[in-house]
Amino acid sequence: AGMDTISYVLAMEEISKVDASVSVCMSVNNSLVCYGLQEYGTEEQKQKYLVPLAQGKKDGNLYIGAFMLSEPEAGSDATSQRTTAEDKGDHYLLNGTKNWITNGGSASVYLVMAQTDASKGSKGINCLIVEKDWPGVVVAAKENKMGIRGSDTHTVMFNDVKVPKANRIGEDGFGFKFAMKTLAGGRIGIASQALGIASGAYELALAYSK
């Protein structure tokens, strides 16, 4: 708390030297979820979600977040979202599937990008704060990855999940801009992780060569 980006980069590098799984979990929670809420969330959202996310715990239990943009047919092309959030007045009705979600099973809170008005293109996307234990949220089995296996990656499905309007981040239609701005910061975490992994591998190889 209270430290700058350089301090965060140094911490990410050191953790990545010994455990890339821990660092990628940390990167998503801090670079994407916490940063997004800190910069664009309301005071109510910050108090309810950001405080325990920054602490990593709530009521003595693990409390981290996940960022949900990728879908079966929408990866780099974020405007091709198929997940929908139908405006129902005081809440949204969320339906869709998100793939390759880091912290998908271990997270308690999700930042979910969803299309609320397809006719508006990128301006019809919103970001919603969704709690994992809400009715209609289904977490699929953990992906059997080749590496960074300590980091859980899942497909997550939403079936008529009621999301309060108070859980939308920013004004209506801000979701795409939110995702792009947040991901820009997230890339700092990924770059730091890559440097740390490379440094750790070098140190191990050097020690072995002797």
Question: What do these predicted regions represent?
Answer:
Residues T116, V137-K210:
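Glycine-rich beta->alpha junctions and the first turn(s) of the following alpha-helix
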Residues T83-E86:
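A structural signal for short hydrophobic beta-strand segments in well-ordered beta-sheet cores
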Residues Y49, Q81, T97-N99, A140-N144:
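Short beta-alpha junctions and helix-cap segments that line functional grooves
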Residues G60-S70:
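A short, Trp-centered hydrophobic/proline-enriched beta-strand micro-motif
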Residues E73-S76, W100-N103, D117-S119, K145-D152:
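Short Gly/Pro-enriched turn/cap motifs at secondary-structure boundaries
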Residues M12-S16, M113-A114, V130-P135, N159-V163:
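Short Ser/Thr-interspersed hydrophobic loop/turn segments at strand-loop and sheet-helix junctions
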Residues A1-N61, T102-V109, K120-G121, I188:
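Internal helix-loop-helix
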Residues H91, N95-V139:
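A short core secondary-structure module
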